[in-house]
Amino acid sequence: MRILTILILGTLLLAQDQPTTLKVDVDVVSILASVRDKKNALIPSLQKEDFTVLEDGKPQTIKYFTKETDLPLTIGLLVDVSRSQENLIDIERRAASQFFSQVLRKKDLAFLMSFGEESELLQDYTGSPRLLTDGLGQLRVSGGAGGIHPGPVPTISQQRGTVLFDAIYLAATEKLKGEVGRKVIVVITDGVDQGSKLNRNQAIEAAQKADAVIYSIDYEDPRYHGMFGPSGDPDLKKMSDETGGHVYKVDRSHSLEQVFKELQDEMRSQYSIGYTPSNEVKDGGYRKLDIRAANKDYKVQARKGYYAIKP
């Protein structure tokens, strides 16, 4: 076991026991990609030769390529428990429990966080759908449920509201950074951030540095529509687009159960693409990525860039 402690904005975050993890080869850039056709259907059967990778406009040689069903999956589920979600939480519990039961395999892990006025870890890494379901049972409006082992992930914000950006940052930096395989953050929220100390770009940067993909489930109670200012839809879209994820919208014709089924299908239809950058300078700078499919009718969904972290 190892202890992980991070300091954010002058606030010392609580150290927690973490599972020992393997380190990734820092010279290899790994990209998760999904491919869709013009009808938005997933394309799961492409080969390495069907892809082109550009870094800052320069072609790169793909060294590693695999279907994502072969790699372990680490999921962080973040559930909005602010007042605007009060009438949706029971539905979220049931749908998320079913999702974990269907998507997790023996080598996969997941953790569960809630966020409202603060962020809280309800269930640490586990491969047990039963433990995750128990954690879902502890969801409570406005800040989650207290006293759940191993305790709260300290929030950055002390203001009242919905600390969406802070929660994503904490999930990426405290939980996912350093893990191997596929790393996914699934956020269930109406997208309206209120009270975070960090901004949207900082949340995106944290996810990119952790090689994590953000999938946003836009779930809004119609009774609260417009009550908290502008829609959070643009924020959800930006965070998902920049990290290679997708926004799923729950509405009368598209249930949360259906959304989780589509998300599961996408996770099982991904490609992992790896290359060694021709630019060997590790200056901490941002490198733009452009992943293309040979078939012009296909659209590749992948992160827009990465940070060349200094050794």
PLM feature segments, named:
Residues 1-4, 19:
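Compositionally biased, low-complexity segments enriched in small residues
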Residues 3-14:
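Sec-dependent N-terminal signal peptides
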Residues 15-311:
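Scaffold/interface architecture of coatomer-like assemblies
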